[in-house]
Amino acid sequence: MDISIFREYDIRGIYPTTLDEKSAFSIGVELGKIMRECDKSVFVGHDARVHGRFLFEALSAGLQSSGLKVYDLGLIPTPVAYFAAFNGINGIQCPNSIMITGSHNPKEYNGFKITLNQNPFYGKDIQALKDTLLNAKHEIKPLKETPEKVNALEAYQRYLIKDFKHLKNLKYKIALDFGNGVGALGLEPILKALNIDFSSLYSDPDGDFPNHHPDPSEAKNLKDLEKHMQENAILIGFAFDGDADRIAMLSSHHIYAGDELAILFAKRLHAQGITPFVIGEVKCSQVMYNTINTFGKTLMYKTGHSNLKIKLKETNAHFAAEMSGHIFFKERYFGYDDALYACLRALELLLEQSPSDLENTIKNLPYSYTTPEEKIAVSEEEKFEIIHNLQKALKNPPSHFPTIKEIISIDGVRVVFEHGFGLIRASNTTPYLVSRFEGKDETTALEYKRALLNLLEKL
């Protein structure tokens, strides 16, 4: 078995090169042994990738061979698999789910996002599973029985239609780009039931992603949506990744970063008389933390959807946000990343404000210049050692180095300077260091960038 498929947050590989039916069956066998300790059943769904159903059958056969009953959720967005584990479906209560998805990765990728007893199965859990599988031998077997089909999609939609009934007849038309992922399957029926006017691009699930890559964190993938909004005079738009757990929001003159969405959501909670408690990640802007801290409370934590779900549960914060568009609501919801739910929460902003009001809220924040996220190629073996050496070097920085106010080491190195910060962290999923810099203006941000990268080069 190719050990490269065992990542920090999930299991992910290239079909059929590093992840195939044989490995899916073996993973099912050993994962089933772990899952049956808390429940004898599991919900399993898949996204639109062309190999999803092949992996579903092999994984399910492995799970069955370990004594688990498999419930077949079919073609669904990832949040629906989470919803099944947290809420139950049609009287079936089961805290385990597996979503077969390649998320926002290229079409040849696929993998497993695992929920065990309503918690993400990640990090040490995945590494322990890998160690077990390296010493195990399994002969692939067919399904013992056809998994029972369960309509989780309709149950999910009923839940959200009820929770967002106050959005009925929203006065704004919205534009949506689903990138040929599975998001439209979940969201469009909800919008129709609420009589919200919308116009969709690429709503048909197609695992070949013929129009553009389904990653809304890349500006180039938003071009079609921007053009569609301009041509049709639509003031607000949303884009989703392939499995609908990440969102991007656009208005006529602005693309909202994840930390800007966090500010808007926190301000609405505050306006409702709630003192918001918000968790951000190390890549979020200092402006976000400073702004929310004027009327609420923030906590900075590690990047990664599994990390933030666990921290949200621990702290009972209202919500958490990542720059990449993962938004996790605990207030009124279950605390997992759901881009379709986040879209509906964003539409609530329009009950009291116009799209231009939202733009003005962001424009009126203290100005800062932030560099794009950049990747530095390093070997998988060296990346964490490099970060460790950088942390040591910063304890005694060069004399010409900008004044350091604080060093935050929860995830890589975030160096807080007088007028901004510099971040260098090891990616948990790829052989790269990831960097990001912020300053009171472009000159300051680039000064911080030069200083940190020069120090990095000397290590």
What is the predicted function of each stretch?
Residues 1-61, 65-66, 91, 149-172:
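An N-terminal, well-structured beta->alpha segment
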Residues 39-47, 71, 173-175, 276-282:
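Short glycine-rich phosphate-binding loop at a beta-alpha junction
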Residues 41-109, 190-250:
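N-terminal small/polar loop signature for handling phosphorylated ligands or for N-terminal nucleophile
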Residues 78, 130-158, 162-164, 251-323, ...:
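Proline/glycine-rich low-complexity loops and linkers
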Residues 110-230:
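Gly/Ser/Thr-enriched, mixed-charge loops and adjacent short helices
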Residues 122, 200-202, 254-274, 338-348:
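Gly/Ser/Thr-rich active-site loops/lids in small-molecule metabolic enzymes
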Residues 274-436, 442-459:
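Phosphate-binding and adjacent anionic-ligand microenvironments
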